[in-house]
From Swiss-Prot:
One of its GO terms (molecular function) is ubiquinol-cytochrome-c reductase activity. Heme b b566 binds at residues 97, 196. This is Cytochrome b. GO terms for biological process: mitochondrial electron transport, ubiquinol to cytochrome c. The cytochrome bc1 complex contains 11 subunits: 3 respiratory subunits (MT-CYB, CYC1 and UQCRFS1), 2 core proteins (UQCRC1 and UQCRC2) and 6 low-molecular weight proteins (UQCRH/QCR6, UQCRB/QCR7, UQCRQ/QCR8, UQCR10/QCR9, UQCR11/QCR10 and a cleavage product of UQCRFS1). This cytochrome bc1 complex then forms a dimer. It is found in: Mitochondrion inner membrane. It comes from Glaucomys volans. PANTHER family: CYTOCHROME B. GO terms for cellular component: mitochondrial inner membrane; respiratory chain complex III. Heme b b562 binds at residues 83, 182. Heme 1 (or BL or b562) is low-potential and absorbs at about 562 nm, and heme 2 (or BH or b566) is high-potential and absorbs at about 566 nm. Keywords: Electron transport, Heme, Iron, Membrane, Metal-binding, Mitochondrion, Mitochondrion inner membrane, Respiratory chain, Transmembrane, Transmembrane helix, Transport, Ubiquinone. It comes from the Eukaryota.
Amino acid sequence: MTNIRKTHPLIKIVNHSFIDLPXPSNISAWWNFGSLLGFCLIVQIVTGLFLAMHYTSDTMTAFSSVTHICRDVNYGWLIRYMHANGASMFFICLFLHVGRGLYYGSYTYFETWNIGVILLFAVMATAFMGYVLPWGQMSFWGATVITNLLSAIPYIGTTLVEWIWGGFSVDKATLTRFFAFHFILPFIIAALAMIHLLFLHETGSNNPSGLISDSDKIPFHPYFSIKDTLGFLILILIFMTLVLFTPDLLGDPDNYTPANPLNTPPHIKPEWYFLFAYAILRSIPNKLGGVLALVFSILILMLFPILHMSKQRSMMFRPLSQCLFWILVADLFTLTWIGGQPVEHPFITIGQVASILYFTIILILLPLISLLENKLLKW
C-alpha cells in the first residue's frame, strides 16, 4: 500500500512543502523567520477575527467599542494586546527576514523576492489601516496626515484624497472602508505568502554560503520542523512577555484620547515600524519629493537584483560589503530614532544626512564596493 502522504492530491502538496521538502543542511537560524512570519500572520488573523466580533466601525462608537473589548469581553484585553503587539512582532520578523535576504543574496530569486516586496507593501498598508481603527487621537491624525500625502500627486491628487476619504475629511466613511480593507487584506497576504512559497520551492532555499547546495540536502521534517519549533517558542516567550508585562510599551499614549478633529496632538507620528520611512518623508522639504522618497525607500528593494555587481551571491566572504551592510542597519536605526523626534534642530539635519546615506549606500556604495571586491579577488 502506498503512503497516503505521498499520493493524496491535497496531502501531497503539504508533504512537498513541509515534510519531504529538501532543504540545505547548513541554513542557520536566520532562515527561521519565514515560518515565524506565517505564525505571526495566523495569530493576527485569529485575534483580529475575535476583535471584529465586538468592534464597531462607526466614529461615534469605535473608541467605546475598543474600551468595551478591554473591560467587558472575556479576555478581551488579552486579544486586543496580542493583536496590537502581534503587529510589532510581525514587523520585527519582517525586517530580520528582509535583512537576511539582503545579506545572503536571496534577492537573486527574482519572483520570490518581488512577491516578498509586494507582501511588505501589503502588510504595511494593513498595519496603517489597523492603526486608524481604535479612533484615538493618533489614529485620526495619522490617517489625516498619511492620506493627505496623496494630494501631492499632480492634477488628480486632491480628488483622489477626497475619494479615499469618502468626503472632505477623515470621517465615518473613511473609518468604515478602512475596517473593510483591514479585514480583507490579511487573507490576500496569506494568498500572496503561498505564491511566495510556491516560487521559493521552484528553486529551493538559498544558504549562508550562497553556493549551490543540491549535493547536500536534508528533509525538512524532522530537522527544520524541530528547529522552527524552537523559533516559535522563543518568539512566543518574547511576544507574551511584551503582551502580559508591558502591553503599551510600543504604543502611543495619545491613542488613549478619543479622536478630536479640533485638537491636533503636538507630535504626530506613526507606529515605530514606520518611523524610518516617516523620517525619510520629513527630511525632504518638498511635499511631492517627500512622498516619492517615502515610496522609493521601500520600492528600492526591487532594485537589489539589478544592483548586484559581485561575482559572489552571499556577503559571507565579502568583508567590505559586510561593513557597508551593517552601516546601513545602523543608518536605519538612526532614521527610526529621528522619525520619533520633533521637527527641530539638530534632528532635521541628522534626518537629512541619514536619508541621503540610506540611498547612497544602496544605489552607489554597495555596487561599487562589490566591483572592488571582484577586482581584489582578480575575478
